[in-house]
A protein has these predicted regions:
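Rossmann-like adenosine-cofactor binding region
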Residues: 12-104
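Short, well-ordered beta-strand core segments
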Residues: 5, 33, 111-113
Length: 251
């Protein structure tokens, strides 16, 4: 059981890294495909239109496609045409062509749509800001005393009690929704009147925390506990040792 993970990274492959596959090998062998490449328009490893019409056509029926890099990496029109004809791909779309003036036609053929917020967690923003702060301090030879952890505010929900008889799937659903109710973003996105509302969604995006901000309680199965820890959640083995940082909620 589990996943067989394939990774395609052409620049790293050229640098000699082992264990990577070509893009076409990955597309041919994968039932779940996650794209999070930057957009580069020139050079040997240009990513613009990387998933072109030919590759879109070649995707196996039932493929789950997560687009979380840049919109122009995928031929979105080819995806739309395939979905209009067959509607046989499971689409999770976070990035779009011509942001912020996007075409909303693909909404009706997607399982989940979000306004380019894959990197919008508070931790992600704070991490980037702290890196700039550290670089400035180093440049001006200033002493840095503040750590990133010391600057992070306490989460609104710090702990979540999981039913002791919950399955792995139930545990994952409860924990993920406890940090990030994904379908609320989807509902806001689908409420757009037109593509021009996209920028407003990003500017008014609510605070979102990462998995590491939430500690899980009550998991009785060691395998599930290890799985959730691997996803980045805090997992309390002994409830007597929990350090309370905020309210405890139970789903």
């Amino acid at each position: 059981a589990g996943f067989n993970l394939l990774i395609c990274d052409p620049p790293q492959a050229c640098a000699g890294q082992k264990g990577l596959v070509t893009l076409d090998e990955l597309l041919a062998q994968s039932q779940i495909i996650c794209l999070h490449t930057p957009l580069t328009k020139q050079g040997r490893h240009a990513t613009e239109n990387l998933i072109n019409a030919q590759r879109v056509t070649g995707l196996a029926k039932g493929t789950l496609l997560i687009s979380a890099g840049r919109g122009e990496v995928i031929d979105q029109q080819a995806v739309l045409e395939r979905q209009q004809q067959h509607n046989d791909l499971h689409l999770y779309m976070d990035v779009w062509h011509q942001e912020p003036n996007i075409d909303i036609q693909l909404f009706g053929y997607s399982h989940c749509v979000t306004p380019h917020v894959a990197g919008h967690s508070l931790e992600g923003k704070m991490r980037g800001t702290h890196m700039i702060f550290q670089a400035l301090c180093q440049h001006f030879d200033l002493h840095v005393s503040e750590t990133l952890d010391s600057l992070m505010p306490a989460p609104k929900r710090a702990q979540l009690a999981i039913s002791s008889n919950a399955t792995a799937k139930q545990t994952m659903q409860q924990a993920c929704n406890g940090v990030y109710p994904l379908m609320e973003d989807d509902a806001r996105m689908r409420g757009m009147q037109n593509g021009h509302d996209f920028d407003g969604l990003r500017k008014t995006y609510p605070v979102r925390r990462e998995f590491s901000s939430l500690q899980l309680r009550g998991i009785a199965d060691a395998e599930i506990s290890n799985m959730m820890a691997g996803l980045g959640f805090g997992v309390a083995v002994d409830t007597n040792t929990i350090k309370t940082q905020g309210p405890v909620n139970e789903l």
